[in-house]
UniProtKB/Swiss-Prot annotation:
Name of this protein: Protein lin-37 homolog
Gene: Lin37
Organism: Mus musculus
Keywords: Acetylation, Isopeptide bond, Phosphoprotein, Ubl conjugation
Positions where N-acetylmethionine occurs in the chain: 1
Subunit structure: Component of the DREAM complex (also named LINC complex) at least composed of E2F4, E2F5, LIN9, LIN37, LIN52, LIN54, MYBL1, MYBL2, RBL1, RBL2, RBBP4, TFDP1 and TFDP2. The complex exists in quiescent cells where it represses cell cycle-dependent genes. It dissociates in S phase when LIN9, LIN37, LIN52 and LIN54 form a subcomplex that binds to MYBL2.
Phylogenetic lineage: Eukaryota, Metazoa, Chordata, Craniata, Vertebrata
Gene Ontology terms: biological process: G0 to G1 transition; gene expression
InterPro entries reported in the protein's UniProt record: LIN37 (IPR028226)
GO CC terms: transcription repressor complex
Pfam families: LIN37
Lineage top rank: taxon: Eukaryota
Cross-link (Glycyl lysine isopeptide (Lys-Gly) (interchain with G-Cter in SUMO2)): 5, 7
Sequence positions bearing Phosphothreonine: 167
Segments of this protein annotated with the region Disordered: 39-90, 129-208
Amino acid sequence: MFPVKVKVEKSEMEMAKARNQLDAVLQCLLEKSHMDRERLDEEAGKTPLDTHNKDCSIAATGKRPSARFPHQRRKKRREMDDGLAEGGPQRSNTYVIKLFDRSVDLAQFSENTPLYPICRAWMRNSPTVRERERSPGSPLPPLPEDGEGSEVINSKNRDVYKLPPPTAPGPLGDACRSRIPSPLQPETEGTPDDEPSEPEPSPSTLIYRNMQRWKRIRQRWKEASHRNQLRYSESMKILREMYDRQ
């Protein structure tokens, strides 16, 4: 007698169990995201000394605080905020995001804030430190200048606020001429009228004849570009020193 294969369908109870497991996993992920957000907010509101003391206490006991009930921590945090509101000025709202292991508080910026201050705060990686606000109409502070107005030198480092201008290219009106070489005169060979003219050369022959001329023209452009770059040698020297100090 041959064995008979019997197809067993999943019961409603197994499907309900699978759904409950999926709901539990999604709930854990949701609570984990809330916990991560709250931990980031707490780290943003603490000083580096508090964070160091907390890490030392965890390392000494070998236990970490329980995170099974995030709603209790939210309630405690709400009570602390209410206490701050009653006892002193309330802390301003924060919106801290973490991008590539660096955090920045976006609540301190408005919609019209340029991108550069936001990037500068992100590079600083200190969400608790706020950028100094400056009204759009207020003028920029004057730059410290010396006799030439190009740089300031103190005892520790060298702060450069303005690069020196390039050297003069020559007589007045020769600025463009310093970048563009003088044209190379064509080489013409006159033939007597009584001699018969040569037949028209092929394209390969013309390319071969003009190859040397093209090489000379390209070399003249390279020399003119090099001479023009020498006018900025002082600026390049300052930039090189700034790069080497990093």
